[in-house]
Swiss-Prot record:
GO biological process, one term: positive regulation of vasoconstriction
Source organism of the structure: Ovis aries
Keywords in alphabetical order: Cell membrane, Disulfide bond, G-protein coupled receptor, Glycoprotein, Membrane, Phosphoprotein, Receptor, Transducer, Transmembrane, Transmembrane helix
Family indicated by similarity: Belongs to the G-protein coupled receptor 1 family. Vasopressin/oxytocin receptor subfamily.
Cytoplasmic side: 64-74, 136-154, 226-277, 335-391
Lineage of the organism: Eukaryota, Metazoa, Chordata, Craniata, Vertebrata
Sites of Phosphoserine modification: 370
Compartment(s): Cell membrane
Residues on Extracellular side: 1-38, 98-113, 176-202, 297-311
The name this protein goes by in its record: Oxytocin receptor
Designated gene of the protein: OXTR
Length: 391
């Protein structure tokens, strides 16, 4: 993860390489070294994160496929966000895991550029699909009539994926297979000095973290205001209903209007607030996981005296990787019926197969018994015919 777009000194701090940051052609005199104990811990944690991300998001996609409410708007965005998290696991966590095992990149230049490109594609997609889902929840609360256009959702998701593919294109130019020491090659970034690293890391931080967080904060600010407004409306409607009941039949129309307003507010507070809570927790997990990583990157490029300890980069990278496997557990917490349906479907299929195999065995056993019975009767009749009759 730290190698997805990080400058060379980030990789230098983690891997222990002494290659100068952003320079081409300068090499170290001795072979590169690294902290093997720290590398083993990183490999173990990344392996666990990869397993949880693959299994969790695969279960979410399978549950969304088998549910009866698969055409729900929220489930549509959850499906694409799970696909993006799978992309992060396969194209970002897995290459980083293999890279930590081998220490150096072993592959052609084309593979180096492709891996670096796909690493950032998954990161962009996960961020902006989360942003898209939050905007959808904001529209569902603030403007429910406009949120009913499903075709617009599909176009927005398609545009998001295409935009992520385009925004990740600079990775192909920046990273390449280069000689970082005498006879040692690695997938390395080369920037124009001295402003290149600052410009690129700042742009990535703005595009993937700061701007999305600002938009997400605005969305949930509007959602909070709308919820507060509806709660206030509910209180006023309840008071109007009570006053209408006290005044009698003369205020019957006002009482009915109050009841309608109350039922409308209850609908918002029960049917939509739960989904808003879920997306808010997903956003909060995104902020918690990615803040140390981007803070460390920005500190490294803008402060020449910033510490470059390997442990700090490792912790920030592992925390960022954790975001790809925590979303399925959040989905499970707020939409538990999805996984209950999946478990029930699995148990039903297993029971049917078991019952079918038992029925097959029973039918075969019955056929064997009937065939044995026929043979025994036939043999007994033959014995009775062969015996002489006695008077």
């Amino acid at each position: 993860m730290e190698g997805a777009f990080a400058a060379n000194w980030s990789a230098e701090a983690v891997n222990g390489s002494a290659a100068p940051p952003g320079t081409e052609g300068n090499r170290t005199a001795g072979p590169p070294q690294r902290n093997e104990a720290l590398a083993r811990v990183e490999v173990a944690v990344l392996s666990l994160i990869l397993f949880l991300a693959l299994s969790g998001n695969a279960c979410v996609l399978l549950a969304l496929r088998t549910t009866r409410h698969k055409h729900s708007r929220l489930f549509f965005f959850m499906k694409h966000l799970s696909i993006a998290d799978l992309a992060v696991a396969v194209f970002q966590v897995l290459p980083q895991l293999l890279w930590d095992i081998t220490f150096r990149f072993y592959g052609p230049d084309l593979l180096c550029r492709l891996v670096k490109y796909l690493q950032v594609v998954g990161m962009f997609a996960s961020t902006y699909l989360l942003l898209l889902m939050s905007l959808d929840r904001c529209l569902a609360i603030c403007q429910p009539l406009r949120s009913l256009r499903r075709r617009t959702d599909r176009l927005a998701v398609l545009a998001t994926w295409l935009g992520c593919l385009v925004a990740s294109a600079p990775q192909v130019h920046i990273f390449s297979l280069r000689e970082v020491a005498d006879g040692v090659f690695d997938c390395w970034a080369v920037f124009i000095q001295p402003w290149g690293p600052k410009a690129y890391i700042t742009w990535i931080t703005l595009a993937v973290y700061i701007v999305p967080v600002i938009v997400l904060a605005a969305c949930y600010g509007l959602i909070s205001f709308k919820i507060w407004q509806n709660l206030r409306l509910k209180t006023e409607a309840a008071a109007a209903e009570a006053s209408a009941g006290a005044e009698g039949a003369a205020a019957d129309c006002a009482g009915r209007a109050a009841l309608a307003r109350v039922s409308n507010v209850k609908l918002i507070s029960k049917a939509k607030i739960r989904t808003v809570k879920m997306t808010f927790i997903v956003v909060l997990a995104f902020i918690v996981c990615w803040t140390p990583f981007f803070f460390k990157q920005m500190w490294s490029v803008w402060d020449a005296d910033a510490p470059k300890e390997a442990s700090a980069f490792i912790i920030a990278m592992l925390l960022a990787s954790l975001n790809s496997c925590c979303n399925p557990w959040i989905y499970m917490l707020f939409t538990g019926h999805l996984f209950q349906d999946l478990v029930q479907r699995f148990l039903c299929c297993s029971f049917r197969r078991l019952k079918g195999s038992q029925l097959g065995e029973t039918s075969v056993t019955k056929k064997i018994h009937s065939y044995t019975f026929v043979l025994s009767r036939h043999s007994s009749s033959q014995r009775s015919c062969s015996q002489p009759s006695t008077v």
